[in-house]
Design a protein with these regions (language model features):
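Juxtamembrane/disordered regions of integral membrane proteins
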Residues: 1-150
Length: 150
């Protein structure tokens, strides 16, 4: 339980990094049809409320991924925190591709948006997972190096 705050902060940092990639993607005009916050809001019946989509996006990144990392980290194979983050993010990507994309109307793996959709979302999830695991590992290492006070 003591690692939940560290995992949540790691989720926040990773979600901010991922969100910056979303903003850069949109600013460069890359795949404008792949607007994940708007898709999330649309799945909630409010396609014209992208702020709702952003809020849910941050909830997923901070709370769900943070909790998953804190709960599963010690049970995942290997010792690499980056590897654990990437593994969790890849599992999340796969769920997104086979459950959420069809619900959003973009088809299995989002292929109605083109072959770039699953490739781009996988790349973004891999980056997210690497940042998630790296920050979490760094936070745990800092905790281990801080001397206990009497």
């Amino acid at each position: 339980m003591k690692n939940f705050p560290k995992a949540m902060i790691a989720g926040l940092v990773a979600t901010i990094v991922l969100s910056l990639f979303f903003v850069m993607k949109d600013a460069m005009g890359i795949m404008p049809q792949l607007d994940l916050p708007r898709m999330i809001a649309g799945m909630m019946g409010m396609p014209d409320a992208p702020r709702l989509g952003w809020a849910v996006h941050f909830f997923i990144g901070v709370v769900l991924y943070g909790a998953a990392l804190a709960l599963l980290d010690e049970h995942l194979p290997g010792n690499s925190k980056i590897g654990h983050g990437v593994l969790l993010a890849t599992a999340g990507w796969l769920m997104m591709m086979v459950v959420l994309m069809p619900i959003a109307g973009t088809g299995l793996f989002g292929l109605n948006l083109g072959i770039s959709a699953p490739i781009m979302t996988l790349m973004l999830h891999l980056i997210f997972g690497a940042v998630l695991g790296a920050y979490y590992g760094h936070a745990l290492a800092r905790q281990a190096s801080v001397p206990l006070r009497a």
